[in-house]
Amino acid sequence: MRIAAIYDVHGNLPALEAVLEEIRKEGVSQLVVGGDVVPGPLPKETLACLLGLHVATEFIYGNGEVALLDQLSGRDPSAVPEQYRPIIRWTAQQLSDQGHLFASWPKTYSVAIPGLGHVLFCHATPRNENEVFTRLTAEDRLLPIFAGLDRQVVVCGHTHMQFDRRIGSTRVVNAGSVGMPFGEPGADWLLLDEDGIRLRHTSYDLKEAADRIRQSGYPAADEFVARSLSNPPAEKEMLEAFSHAELK
């Protein structure tokens, strides 16, 4: 069994297409999509791409899908910072008749992989799609969440930075982000099989991607191109930023 895990695509279809091409070459038997497929610049096209794949695909939801479902149902997306709400509203308009496509996605997905054991996929933590932790978060803050899971491996995303660490007896691996990576341009994802877990990075044509994103009508297109394609924030900068929001 070989599984690819992709997280935090955020409507960046060009990045997704490049990663999927790499995944096809790997001959995976299953794809796990770990939430925050949307919001982003090309939400409708990104959803259609993932839902039309000819490989067994499991989806889980992230905080992005929760915010969009709140917006589509008329509920106040209270967990969304004010500066991001125009993006949520715009994405919801693009997906006004498609909320049902992701409304049934579960919070977690589990599978047994020979050589790795039981693997749990979640968006942020197994209990919550919004919680923040990084490779530097103190283990004692995280043990109450990961102890007693009866899973050898947990795969997560949410913070857009790859890592591979131990929390108690559990191996916890962050897949990074396909569409909005921090650290360097490109797209991050995971490959899991009996030989282990590999952090993968895929390059793609950033100029062509920028042109498509700018033509999408996305209200934050220039900022997205600058911060998610051309010049992503450095890992050091984001670790410092997340240190103020991480689990205490």
Residue spans of the language-model regions?
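Anionic-ligand binding region
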Residues: L136-V178
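Beta-strand-turn-beta hairpins that frame and shape the catalytic cleft
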Residues: M1-A4, S110-L120, I167-R171
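Active-site-proximal loop/helix segment associated with metal-binding centers of metalloenzymes
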Residues: P81-R89, L116, A124-T137, A210-R212, ...
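Active-site environment of divalent metal-dependent phosphoester hydrolases
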Residues: H10-A15, P39-P41, G64-L69, V153-R166, ...
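Acidic, His/Gly-rich catalytic cores of divalent-metal-dependent hydrolytic chemistry
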Residues: R166-K248
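Active-site neighborhood of divalent metal-dependent phosphoester bond hydrolases
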Residues: L53-A112, G117-H118, R135-D150, P219
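Core catalytic region of metal-dependent phosphoesterases/phosphodiesterases
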Residues: R2-Q93
